[in-house]
C-alpha cells in the first residue's frame, strides 16, 4: 500500500476508523471531511482508489450526522479526480460495479435534490470516461427499478447529455426500456413528458431515425392518447423537415419571381444583422489585445488549471486578488489558443471545475478583476458556444445578481456576459424564466436588460424557427407577461427598450403580437404608434419586413381606429390605396441600407474563402443551383464576428495547419503500409508488419491509424507481430508504445515462448512497474473469466484458445518481476486475488506447480499481509492456499490426514517446495490404514480425498490405472517409491530435493532435538485441538465417510480429458459438425458412458478446433447438445450414479458456453436427482458447485425465481432446500432488484426456516439474511424495511445474523 497520507492518517487506518463500532460518529465525520478535502484539492495516489471506495461505501451506510451526505460528495469528487488523472479510464471501468449502482440509486432520492444533481454530474463525468459501462448499468438498474423517480431522472439525464455533450448518444439502445416503463406506468405524466422531450431532441439531431422510432412506439401496447403524445413530436419533425417552403409560400407574392426570392433572403439577413448590431451595443466583440496561448496536450491543460484553482479558495484578500486576476488573464489567453479546437471537451471540463472561481472574480469589488472575469465568461460563450451549457447553469445566478449592482460598470459587464450566453447557448425553459424574474426586479437595470435578452431570443427564433422546439406556447405566454408589464414601466429607458423588442416580436410572431395589442391600454397602443413612425426604417427595430405579413392589415386597422385624423378624413378608395402604398414604403430604405453595409463589412472575409459556403438550415429559402450571383452573394453574407456558426477565432487560425492536415490525409490514404495492415490477406499483413518494422528502424513518422490496426492484428494474427519484438531493443520499445499496456503484455506472452530476466527488464522499461502489475492482473482476470470476456469476438476466441499459454507466461513474468522489483500493498492484494481465482483453472494442469511457486513467493515477501488476505478467502480455496504455503488452518476441527505437518519442519522459501513425500520407513508409533481401491470415473457411491486416491492408485499394479493417474497427478520422479500408508501427526516427514526420499542429513543436532521435544510434548495434542469452531457445531457429520475432493470440477475434468483423449485417438474421431451431430444422436438413442465421453471430448477440444467448428458450436451446436442432454437425462436410470454424475459434468461444461439454457428443466433435474440424496453426498457437492458457477444475469434471475417458488412450498427436501439457500446466499448480496415487496417475500421464507428443527435450515436462513443485509445496492426505503423486519426476531437470532454479517 502506498504511504500517501493526509492529516497523518493513512488510508488503511482511516478505513479501520470508519469500520469501527467503538469510535464516535463525530470523529468519523471529521475524517471523511478531511478525505473529501484531500480528494478535491490534491493529486491522489490512484493505487489507493479501492481503499477510498471502501471508506466511502462504509460512510454511505452511516445515516447519522450527515456522514452519508459527505461520503456521497466525496464519491463525486473522487470520480472527477480519477477521470482527470487516469487518462486510460481503466480504474473507473474496474470499479463500475461498485460506483454506478450508488449513483443511479441516488437519482431516486426525492428528499435531496442537491444529491440528485450531484449524482447526474458524476454520471456525466463517468460517462465521458466509460460510456459503455454507464449505459449498461442504466439499462440494468435504472429501468428495472420500481422507483419511477429513478426512471424519470435517468431520462432527463439522457436529455441533458444529448443536448449539451454529445449528439451521438445512443438513445435507440434505451428506447425499448423507456417504452416498457411507460407501459407499466401508463398514468405517470412525468415519464411521458420526459420521454417526449428526449425523443424530440434526438430526432431533431437525427431526423433519419424518425420512422424507426414510430415503428417501435406502435409496436408497444400503449394507450392511443399516449402514442399521440409521443408521436406528436415525431410527426412535427416529419412536417418540419422542410419548414421553410411553408413560410416561403405563406409570405411570397403571387408569382415566384427572382425579386421575391431576393426579398425573402433579405428578411433572413435582416434578422442576422439586427442580432449582430444588438450584441455590438453590449460590447460583444472579442478583445484582440489578448495574445493566444497554445497548449501541448490535454495533460498540460489539466495541470495548468489545477495550478489556477488554489488561489480561488476562500475569500478574496489583498494577497490573492492579483493572483486571481493574473490567472483569469491567462485563461483568456488559453481560450484563444488551440485548446478550444483540439481539446474542446477537456477545456470544458476545466472551466466547469473553475466556474466557482470565475464567479468569485466577477463578484469582486476590484474593477479590473471583475471586468476580466466577465470578459472571460463572454469569451467562453462566444468560442465554446453550446459546449458551455453544462457550465452556464452555475454562472447565471452570479451574473444576474451582478446585473442589479449599483456600480454601473459591474452591471454593464454582467449584462454583456449574460447576453453572450443567450446568444450562443441552445434554448432551455430556464432562459425565459430568468427573463421573467429579471423583469420584476425593483431596479430598472435588470428590467431593461431582460428585454435585451428577450430581444436576442426573438431574433434567434426568427433566424431558426426550430430554435425553441416545442416550447412555443410557454415562450409566448412569458413574453406577453413581460411586455404587459414593461411597456408601461415607470422608467422611460425601459419603455423604449420594450417598444423596440415588441416590434421584433411582431415580425417573429405576428398573430400573437396582434392578440397582445388588443389587450393593451389605448395610451400604450398610441405610444407604440409613435415609436413606429419615429423608427423610420432605421435602427434595430424596423416596423416591417419587405414582404408583407398576414397580420399587418389588422395592425393598421388598430392604429387607424385610434387615429382621429385618419377617421375624420375618410379618403376615397383610390387615396386609401395610395396611403396604403405609402405605409408599405416606409421600411423600404432599411433593408437596402443593411444589405449594403453588410456587403461592405463582408468583402474581406469572402476573399480568403473561395469555396461555396454551406447554407444555414434556418434560411427562409432553399439555395438553388441555378440562382444568379446576386442570390448567391446574399446566402454568403456573414459578419466578421459571426454568432451562430463559427467562432471568430477560427477565422484567424493559421492556414498552414489546414495544409498540413490535407497533406496528412493524402499520405494516409495512399500509404501502402496502412493498406497492407488493414487487409484481410495474411501475406499482405505480414508485408505490412515488415514495412512497419523498417519504418520504425528508419525513425519515420507513423500515422495515427497504426495503433488501432495493430490492436486488431494482435487479436487475430498475433504471431505476425513477432518481428516487431524480436529484431532489436529499439523496435521492441517503439512497437510497445503503439499498443495499450494490456495488449502489449498479451502480445509478449504469446510471442515469446519463455520469459527470462532480459525480456522482463525490457518490458518494464516500456511500461512502469505498477502498470506492469496492473496489466498482468487484468490478463489473469480475463483467463479466469473465460469465456465471459469483454471485447471483440477475436479477443474472446484468442483468450479461450491460448489461456494456458498466457497464464504460464504471466506467472513466469510475475515471478521474475517480484524477485526484482518492489510491490505495493494494493498490487500485492490484487495479485493474490487473481492467483486465488486461478486455482480452479490450473488445478488439473501442468502449470499448477508454477502457481504454487508464486503463492510461496508472495508469502515470502510479506507473510503478515498474506495471512490477512487468506482470511478473506472462502472455505475450500482458503484451505488450498494454506496447504500450498504451509499455513496451518485455524478454522478446521480436524487436520486432514493427507496433509503434512509443517510444524515439524522448517521450510526454506528458496527451497524446492513442489514435492512433498512421506517417509519410506514409518516409525513404530505410526498409525497405518489400508484403503480400498476406488472405482473408475466415480462409479461407486463413495468419494475419497484426492490426495489419498493419488497415493493408493500410484501403487496399484494395474498398468491402465497407473497410466491414468500418472497423467492426472503432477510429475514426480519418486512416484514408484511412494508408500501406501497414511501417516498421522507424528509421522516422519521429509522434504525431497529432486526426488530424494531420505531426511536431509544436513540438519544439525539442535534441530533434531527440537523436533523430538515437540513430538514428546504431552500438551501438544491438546493445543492442536484448540480451534475456532462453527457456531452450528451440533450439525454432526458422519466421520466415517471420507471428505469430498474440494475441487470436484477440476478433478473430474482432468480424468475426463485424459481418458477421452485416449479414446479419441483410438477411434480416430474428428472435430467436425457432422461427427458432432452424430454423437448427439447416439447420446439420445443409446445413453452410455462411451457416448458421454465422446461428447465431453467434443466440448473439451473446442479450444484446439478449427474456426469453422467453433462458430458452428457457439451458434448451433450448443443448443443441439442441450436438447440431447435433456433427452439423455429423461431416459437414463437415476439410480446409476456414475452415469448421472458424468452427465452432470458434461452439463456443467456446456453451461460455460450456453447462457440461455432451459432453467425449468435444469431445476426439475435438480429435484429429480437430489430428492433421495444426503447433504454430504457426491451429487449434493456436484450440484452446489454447478449452481455457484452460474454467472449470466438472465440465467441467475430465472433460477432464483425457481428456487424461491420451491422454498415457498409446503414440503421441502433438506438437500434441495440447502442447495437453493446456498444459491440465494450468493445472489442476494449483490441483488440490484430488491424492493419492499421482495423483502417481505424473502422474510416470509427465511422466517419459516428459523423455526425448523433441522439445524441446516436455520444456519442457511441466517446466512441468507446476513447477505441480504450486507447488500449495498438497496435504496434507503428498502434498508429501513430490512431493519424493521429484522427487529421482529428474537435477540439471539439478530445476534447470529450480525455475526455472519461480519464474516
UniProtKB/Swiss-Prot annotation:
Q: Which GO terms describe its biological process?
A: astral microtubule depolymerization; cell division; mitotic spindle assembly
Pfam families on file: CLASP_N
SMART domains from the UniProt entry = TOG
Q: Which UniProt keywords apply?
A: Cell cycle, Cell division, Cytoplasm, Cytoskeleton, Microtubule, Mitosis, Nucleus
Could you name the Gene Ontology cellular component terms for this entry?
A: cytoplasmic microtubule; microtubule organizing center; mitotic spindle; mitotic spindle midzone; nucleus; spindle microtubule
Transmembrane ranges, per UniProt, are: none
Keyword Cytoplasm carried by entry: yes
Record's InterPro entries?
ARM-like (IPR011989), ARM-type_fold (IPR016024), CLASP_N_dom (IPR024395), TOG (IPR034085)
Composition-biased stretches, type Polar residues, lie in 249-259, 573-583, 618-629, 653-664, 955-972
Region Disordered: list its residue ranges: 239-259, 531-664, 953-977
Compartments annotated for it: namely: Cytoplasm, Cytoskeleton; Nucleus; Cytoplasm, Cytoskeleton, Spindle
Q: State one molecular function term (GO).
A: microtubule binding
Q: Where is the composition biased (Basic and acidic residues)?
A: 554-568, 596-609, 634-648
Tell me the subunit arrangement.
Interacts with microtubules.
Q: Which family does it belong to?
A: Belongs to the CLASP family.
What task does this protein carry out? Microtubule binding protein that promotes the stabilization of dynamic microtubules. Required for mitotic spindle formation.
Name of the protein in its database record? Protein STU1
Amino acid at each position: 500500500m502506498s504511504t500517501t497520507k493526509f492529516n497523518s492518517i493513512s488510508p488503511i487506518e482511516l478505513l479501520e476508523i470508519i469500520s469501527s463500532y467503538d469510535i464516535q460518529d463525530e470523529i468519523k465525520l471529521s475524517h471523511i471531511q478531511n478525505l473529501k478535502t484531500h480528494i478535491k484539492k490534491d493529486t491522489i495516489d490512484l493505487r489507493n482508489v479501492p481503499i477510498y471506495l471502501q471508506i466511502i461505501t462504509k460512510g454511505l451506510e452511516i445515516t447519522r450526522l450527515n456522514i452519508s451526505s459527505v461520503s456521497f460528495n466525496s464519491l463525486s469528487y473522487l470520480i472527477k479526480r480519477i477521470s482527470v488523472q487516469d487518462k486510460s479510464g481503466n480504474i473507473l471501468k474496474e470499479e463500475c460495479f461498485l460506483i454506478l449502482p450508488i449513483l443511479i440509486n441516488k437519482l431516486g432520492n426525492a428528499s435531496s435534490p442537491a444529491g440528485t444533481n450531484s449524482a447526474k454530474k458524476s454520471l456525466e463525468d463517468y460517462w465521458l470516461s466509460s460510456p459503455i459501462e454507464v449505459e449498461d448499468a442504466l439499462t440494468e438498474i435504472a429501468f428495472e427499478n420500481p422507483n419511477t423517480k429513478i426512471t424519470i431522472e435517468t431520462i432527463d439525464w439522457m436529455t441533458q447529455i444529448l443536448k449539451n455533450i454529445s449528439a451521438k448518444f445512443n438513445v435507440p439502445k434505451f428506447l425499448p426500456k423507456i417504452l416498457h416503463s411507460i407501459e407499466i406506468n401508463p398514468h405517470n405524466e412525468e415519464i411521458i413528458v420526459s420521454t417526449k422531450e428526449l425523443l424530440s431532441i434526438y430526432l431533431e439531431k437525427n431526423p433519419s431515425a424518425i420512422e424507426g422510432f414510430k415503428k417501435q412506439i406502435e409496436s408497444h401496447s400503449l394507450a392511443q392518447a399516449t402514442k399521440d403524445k409521443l408521436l406528436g413530436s415525431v410527426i412535427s419533425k416529419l412536417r418540419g423537415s422542410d419548414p421553410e417552403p411553408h413560410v416561403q409560400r405563406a409570405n411570397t407574392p403571387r408569382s415566384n419571381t427572382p425579386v421575391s426570392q431576393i426579398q425573402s433572403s433579405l428578411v433572413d439577413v435582416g434578422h442576422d444583422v439586427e442580432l449582430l448590431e444588438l450584441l455590438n451595443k453590449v460590447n460583444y466583440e472579442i478583445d484582440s489585445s489578448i495574445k493566444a496561448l497554445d497548449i501541448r496536450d490535454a495533460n498540460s491543460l489539466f495541470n495548468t488549471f489545477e495550478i489556477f484553482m488554489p488561489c480561488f479558495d476562500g475569500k478574496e484578500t489583498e494577497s490573492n486578488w492579483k493572483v486571481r486576476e493574473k490567472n483569469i488573464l491567462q485563461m483568456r489567453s488559453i481560450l484563444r489558443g488551440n485548446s478550444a479546437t483540439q481539446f474542446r471537451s477537456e477545456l470544458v471540463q476545466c472551466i466547469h471545475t473553475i466556474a466557482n472561481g470565475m464567479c468569485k472574480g466577477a463578484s469582486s469589488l476590484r474593477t479590473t478583476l471583475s471586468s476580466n472575469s466577465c470578459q472571460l465568461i463572454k469569451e467562453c460563450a462566444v468560442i465554446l458556444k453550446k459546449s458551455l451549457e453544462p457550465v452556464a447553469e452555475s454562472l447565471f445566478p452570479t451574473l444576474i445578481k451582478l446585473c442589479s449592482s449599483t456600480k454601473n460598470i459591474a452591471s454593464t459587464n454582467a449584462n454583456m456576459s449574460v447576453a453572450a450566453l443567450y446568444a450562443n447557448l441552445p434554448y432551455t425553459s430556464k432562459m425565459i424564466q430568468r427573463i421573467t424574474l429579471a423583469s420584476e426586479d425593483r431596479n430598472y437595470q435588470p428590467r431593461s436588460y431582460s428585454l435585451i435578452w428577450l430581444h436576442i431570443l426573438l431574433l434567434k427564433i426568427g433566424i431558426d424557427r426550430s430554435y425553441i422546439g416545442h416550447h412555443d406556447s410557454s415562450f409566448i405566454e412569458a413574453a406577453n407577461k413581460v411586455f404587459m408589464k414593461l411597456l408601461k414601466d415607470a422608467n422611460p429607458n425601459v419603455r423604449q427598450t420594450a417598444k423596440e423588442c415588441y416590434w421584433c416580436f411582431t415580425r417573429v410572431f405576428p398573430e400573437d403580437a396582434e392578440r397582445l395589442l388588443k389587450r393593451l391600454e389605448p395610451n400604450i397602443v398610441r405610444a407604440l404608434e409613435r415609436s413606429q413612425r419615429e423608427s423610420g426604417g432605421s435602427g434595430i427595430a424596423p416596423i416591417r419586413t419587405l414582404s408583407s405579413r398576414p397580420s399587418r392589415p389588422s395592425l393598421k386597422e388598430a392604429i387607424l381606429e385610434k387615429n382621429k385624423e385618419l377617421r375624420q378624413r375618410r379618403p376615397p378608395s383610390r387615396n386609401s390605396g395610395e396611403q396604403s402604398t405609402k405605409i408599405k414604403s416606409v421600411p423600404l430604405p432599411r433593408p437596402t441600407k443593411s444589405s449594403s453595409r453588410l456587403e461592405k463589412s463582408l468583402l474581406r472575409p469572402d476573399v480568403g474563402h473561395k469555396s461555396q459556403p454551406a447554407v444555414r438550415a434556418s434560411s427562409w429559402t432553399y439555395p438553388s443551383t441555378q440562382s444568379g450571383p446576386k442570390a448567391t452573394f446574399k446566402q454568403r453574407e456573414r459578419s466578421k464576428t459571426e454568432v451562430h456558426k463559427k467562432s471568430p477565432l477560427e477565422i484567424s487560425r493559421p492556414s498552414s495547419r489546414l495544409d498540413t492536415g490535407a497533406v496528412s490525409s493524402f499520405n494516409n490514404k495512399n500509404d501502402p503500409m496502412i493498406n497492407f495492415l488493414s487487409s484481410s490477406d495474411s501475406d499482405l499483413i505480414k508485408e505490412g508488419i515488415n514495412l512497419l518494422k523498417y519504418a520504425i528502424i528508419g525513425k519515420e513518422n507513423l500515422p495515427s491509424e497504426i495503433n488501432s490496426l495493430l490492436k486488431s492484428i494482435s487479436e487475430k494474427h498475433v504471431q505476425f507481430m513477432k518481428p516487431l519484438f524480436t529484431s532489436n531493443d529499439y523496435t521492441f520499445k517503439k512497437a510497445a508504445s503503439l499498443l495499450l499496456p494490456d495488449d502489449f503484455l498479451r502480445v509478449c506472452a504469446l510471442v515469446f515462448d519463455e520469459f527470462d530476466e532480459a525480456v522482463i527488464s525490457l518490458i518494464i522499461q516500456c511500461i512502469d512497474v505498477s502498470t506492469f502489475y496492473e496489466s498482468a492482473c487484468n490478463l489473469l482476470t480475463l483467463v479466469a473469466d473465460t469465456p465471459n470476456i469483454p471485447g471483440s469476438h477475436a479477443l474472446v476466441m484468442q483468450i479461450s484458445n491460448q489461456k494456458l499459454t498466457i497464464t504460464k507466461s504471466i506467472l513466469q513474468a510475475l515471478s521474475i518481476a517480484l524477485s526484482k522489483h518492489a510491490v505495493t500493498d494494493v498490487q500485492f492484494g490484487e495479485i493474490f486475488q487473481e492467483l486465488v481465482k486461478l486455482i480452479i483453472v490450473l488445478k488439473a494442469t501442468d502449470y499448477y506447480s508454477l502457481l504454487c511457486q508464486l503463492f510461496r513467493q508472495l508469502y515470502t515477501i510479506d507473510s503478515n499481509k498474506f495471512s490477512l488476505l487468506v482470511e478473506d478467502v472462502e472455505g475450500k480455496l482458503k484451505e488450498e492456499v494454506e496447504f500450498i504455503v504451509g499455513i496451518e488452518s485455524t478454522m478446521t476441527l480436524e487436520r486432514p490426514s493427507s496433509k503434512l505437518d509443517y510444524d515439524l519442519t522448517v521450510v526454506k522459501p528458496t527451497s524446492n517446495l513442489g514435492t512433498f513425500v512421506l517417509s519410506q520407513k514409518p516409525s513404530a508409533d505410526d498409525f497405518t490404514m489400508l484403503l480400498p481401491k476406488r472405482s473408475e470415473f466415480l462409479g461407486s457411491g463413495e468419494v475419497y480425498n484426492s490426495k489419498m486416491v493419488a497415493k493408493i492408485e500410484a501403487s496399484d499394479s494395474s498398468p491402465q490405472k497407473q497410466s491414468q493417474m500418472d497423467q492426472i497427478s503432477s510429475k514426480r520422479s519418486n512416484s514408484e517409491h511412494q508408500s501406501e500408508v497414511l501417516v498421522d501427526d507424528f509421522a516422519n516427514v521429509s522434504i525431497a530435493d529432486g526426488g530424494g526420499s531420505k531426511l536431509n542429513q544436513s540438519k544439525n543436532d539442535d534441530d533434531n532435538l527440537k523436533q523430538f521435544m515437540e513430538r514428546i510434548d504431552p500438551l501438544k495434542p491438546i493445543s492442536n485441538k484448540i480451534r475456532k469452531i462453527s457456531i452450528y457445531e451440533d450439525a454432526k457429520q458422519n466421520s466415517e465417510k471420507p471428505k469430498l475432493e474440494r475441487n470436484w470440477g477440476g478433478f473430474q475434468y482432468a480424468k475426463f480429458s485424459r481418458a477421452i483423449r485416449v479414446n479419441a485417438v483410438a477411434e480416430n474421431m474428428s472435430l467436425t459438425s457432422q461427427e458432432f451431430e452424430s454423437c448427439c444422436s447416439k447420446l439420445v438413442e443409446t445413453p452410455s458412458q462411451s457416448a458421454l465421453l465422446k461428447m465431453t471430448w467434443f466440448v473439451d477440444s473446442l479450444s484446439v478446433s478449427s474456426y469453422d467448428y467453433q462458430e458452428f458450436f457457439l451458434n448451433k451446436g450448443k443448443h443441439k447438445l442441450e436438447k440431447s442432454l435433456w433427452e439423455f437425462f429423461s431416459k437414463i436410470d437415476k439410480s446409476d450414479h456414475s452415469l448421472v454424475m458424468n452427465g452432470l459434468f458434461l452439463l456443467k461444461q456446456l453451461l460455460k458456453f450456453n447462457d440461455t439454457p432451459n432453467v425449468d428443466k435444469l431445476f426439475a433435474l435438480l429435484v429429480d436427482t437430489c430428492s433421495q440424496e444426503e447433504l454430504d453426498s457426491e451429487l449434493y457437492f456436484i450440484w452446489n458447485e454447478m449452481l455457484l458457477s452460474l454467472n449470466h444475469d438472465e440465467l441467475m434471475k430465472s433460477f432464483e425465481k425457481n428456487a424461491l417458488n420451491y422454498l415457498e412450498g409446503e414440503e421441502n427436501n433438506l438437500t434441495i432446500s440447502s442447495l437453493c439457500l446456498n444459491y440465494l446466499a450468493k445472489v442476494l448480496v449483490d441483488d440490484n432488484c430488491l424492493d419492499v415487496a421482495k423483502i417481505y417475500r424473502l422474510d416470509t421464507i427465511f422466517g419459516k426456516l428459523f423455526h425448523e428443527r433441522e439445524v441446516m435450515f436455520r444456519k442457511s436462513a441466517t446466512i441468507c439474511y446476513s447477505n441480504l443485509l450486507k447488500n449495498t445496492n438497496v435504496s434507503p426505503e428498502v434498508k429501513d424495511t430490512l431493519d424493521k423486519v429484522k427487529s421482529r426476531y428474537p435477540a439471539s437470532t439478530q445476534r447470529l445474523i450480525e455475526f455472519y454479517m461480519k464474516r
